[in-house]
């Protein structure tokens, strides 16, 4: 009857649509259902042998007891022979061995089932993420997306391997044990259930109170994690402004609040657990006393008396753990539901069944009356029209939020237009496959992105089969070869995911070399020189001028000195093009561009 299990799962989250989620989860099992079927068969055999062992031992004890009484009455010498004792002992050992075998088998199969299902869902998530529009990622926190593919799936896997498996074993053991206990003696069984019910009610009442403190503990944990993350990511700025003490004080205060919330939660748990154990002890004493009286009166045999205690222990522990198991499964279902919510997100429009082909893009681009909004009710861009000839340099300028980057996203079909047409060499971009369209572009973004790998691998990201000579040539054209050769391992230098071993300007040079290697028909430079110093900017500008010759190039920049030679300048404001023309013409018109230019060079 005693159980040292912590009775409180303080982090319980319930699924919003439990029945729907369960049915879909069953459908998700697919080819893995046979493993679960075998698990159920193993659980049935495990439960059978677990329940039958005490019953068999009861018969053996009663047989020995009766032979002892007969020997005492007849005055004969009583002796347990090895043949008699060994046979029954061997039978019990076989039962225990069978329990162990079926327990190990069901645990192995359930773990295999959980990991296979985990792998299947993780694959579905990975494929889904590639089919989601950028607008989905814009409105989601990166951590929330990562949580679906990692934490939620791990919680599901853990619940299957522990919570679900233990629940099935517990139900079988409880039903089997209680049935035989009731068969032995209904009154003693009622006494056992009475004390078990009291301990369950006490655990439930305490858990409800604990949840309130647990919620506060979770909030404090989140606050502390955020402060630590801020202190790490902003450590240089904190030191630069001498705010170490203030940052440390905030972290200390959050740590104190977390400790206080945790202490109160743990106090309740540590106070109630001994109380529940006391209740269980009283139950054991009551069963022992009443059972002893019944034994003396001949209403209960010694074998059944000792077997009753075995069944009480077998049933008592899983009964008190049922709440924990159910809470664990509820949390897992909530995690599975969040995974399904991701899998049900609206996807990008599929590529045409028979897409058009551009074997050799030239770079002629036409925007005709383009309209766009993240939702139909909210239009962000309207009536955008302009034409770009092959090999021209187009500059896009405007204040933050004017729509410069959005315009490029529409060109590359990162977002779908709501109206109008975008033509590339006279072909509607929607008639092309996305992969085919994007092969025509090379991008250098404002935020450099380098992955964990060698410098050579990072440069060759867009052309994995590039030779070392091609990689070096691209690096030289981007003015990156010199600094690469100063590194200890040169092109084989391994960069971390944050590439902190090289400067921001050097990271920018590597991304430019990456684009140069791809040799695209159209270039997109989004603030390409915004994170480098003046000298590096001059080197990059010379390299880019060479690269842009004969190529259509879109340049987004706040520093107008980099785009005075553009063939066409688009001035954007609030999602519309308010001016377009070359530098000279726009200055002469005295409009928004002239005002912006004069403000930078006054």
PLM regions: where:
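A short amphipathic helical element positioned immediately N-terminal to and/or at the very start
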Residues: 18-33, 145
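Helix-loop-helix
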Residues: 180-194, 268-337, 342-343
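ABC-type nucleotide-binding domain
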Residues: 78, 351-352, 358-602
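Juxtamembrane helix-loop junctions of ABC transporter transmembrane domains
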Residues: 11-18, 41-42, 49-65, 69, ...
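An intracellular "coupling" helix at the cytosolic face of ABC transporter transmembrane type-1 domains
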Residues: 31, 134-135, 151-160, 164, ...
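Transmembrane helix-loop-helix hairpins at lipid-water interfaces of multipass membrane proteins
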Residues: 36-102, 182-187, 298-302
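Transmembrane helices of ABC transporter permease
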Residues: 31, 35-48, 162-216, 287-300, ...
């Amino acid at each position: 009857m005693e159980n040292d299990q912590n009775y409180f799962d303080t982090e319980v989250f319930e699924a919003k649509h439990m029945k729907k989620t369960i049915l879909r989860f069953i459908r998700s099992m697919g080819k893995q259902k046979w493993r679960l079927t075998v698990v159920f068969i193993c659980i049935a055999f495990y439960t059978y042998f677990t329940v039958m062992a005490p019953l068999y031992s009861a018969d053996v004890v009663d047989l020995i007891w009766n032979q002892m009484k007969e020997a005492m009455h007849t005055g004969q010498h009583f002796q347990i022979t090895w043949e008699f004792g060994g046979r029954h002992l061997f039978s019990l050992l076989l039962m225990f061995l069978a329990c162990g075998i079926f327990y190990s088998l069901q645990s192995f199969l359930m773990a295999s089932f959980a990991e296979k299902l985990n792998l299947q869902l993780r694959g579905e998530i990975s494929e889904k993420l590639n089919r989601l529009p950028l607008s989905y990622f814009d409105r989601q926190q990166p951590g929330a997306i990562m949580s679906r593919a990692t934490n939620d799936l791990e919680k599901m896997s853990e619940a299957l391997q522990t919570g679900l498996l233990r629940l099935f074993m517990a139900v079988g053991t409880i039903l089997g044990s209680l049935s035989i206990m009731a068969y032995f003696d209904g009154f003693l069984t009622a006494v056992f259930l009475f004390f078990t019910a009291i301990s369950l009610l006490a655990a439930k009442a305490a858990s409800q109170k604990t949840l309130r403190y647990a919620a506060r503990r979770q909030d404090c944990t989140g606050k502390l994690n955020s402060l630590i993350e801020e202190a790490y990511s902003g450590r240089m700025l904190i030191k630069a402004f001498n705010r170490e003490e203030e940052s440390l004080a905030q972290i200390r205060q959050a740590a104190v609040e977390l400790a206080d919330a945790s202490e109160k939660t743990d106090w309740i748990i540590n106070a109630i657990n001994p109380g529940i154990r006391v209740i269980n002890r009283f139950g054991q004493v009551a069963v022992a006393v009443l059972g002893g009286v019944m034994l003396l009166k001949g209403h209960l045999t010694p074998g059944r008396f000792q077997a009753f205690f075995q069944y009480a222990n077998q049933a008592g522990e899983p009964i008190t753990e049922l709440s924990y198991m159910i809470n664990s499964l509820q949390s897992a279902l909530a995690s599975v539901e969040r995974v399904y919510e991701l899998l049900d997100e609206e996807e990008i429009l599929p590529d045409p069944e028979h897409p058009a082909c551009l074997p050799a893009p030239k770079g002629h681009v036409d925007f005709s009356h383009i309209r766009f909004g993240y939702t139909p009710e909210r239009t962000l861009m309207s009536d955008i029209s302009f034409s770009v000839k092959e090999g021209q340099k187009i500059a896009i300028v405007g204040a933050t939020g004017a729509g410069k980057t959005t315009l490029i996203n529409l060109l590359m079909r990162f977002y779908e237009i709501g109206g109008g047409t975008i033509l590339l060499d006279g072909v509607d971009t929607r008639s092309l496959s996305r992969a085919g369209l994007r092969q025509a572009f090379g991008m250098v973004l404002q935020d450099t992105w380098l992955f964990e790998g060698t410098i050579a691998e990072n440069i060759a990201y867009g052309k994995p089969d590039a030779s070392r000579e091609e990689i070096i040539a691209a690096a030289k054209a981007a003015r990156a070869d010199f600094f690469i050769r100063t590194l200890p391992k040169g092109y084989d230098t391994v960069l971390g995911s944050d590439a902190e071993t090289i400067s921001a300007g050097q990271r920018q040079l590597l991304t430019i070399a990456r684009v140069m290697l791809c040799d695209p028909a159209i270039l997109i430079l989004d603030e390409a020189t915004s994170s480098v110093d003046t000298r590096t900017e001059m080197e990059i500008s010379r390299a880019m001028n060479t690269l842009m010759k004969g190529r259509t190039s879109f340049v987004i920049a706040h520093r107008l000195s980099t785009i005075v030679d553009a063939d066409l300048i688009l001035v954007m404001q609030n999602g519309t093009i308010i001016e377009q023309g070359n530098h000279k013409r726009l200055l002469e018109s005295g409009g928004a561009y002239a005002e912006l230019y004069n403000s930078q060079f006054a």
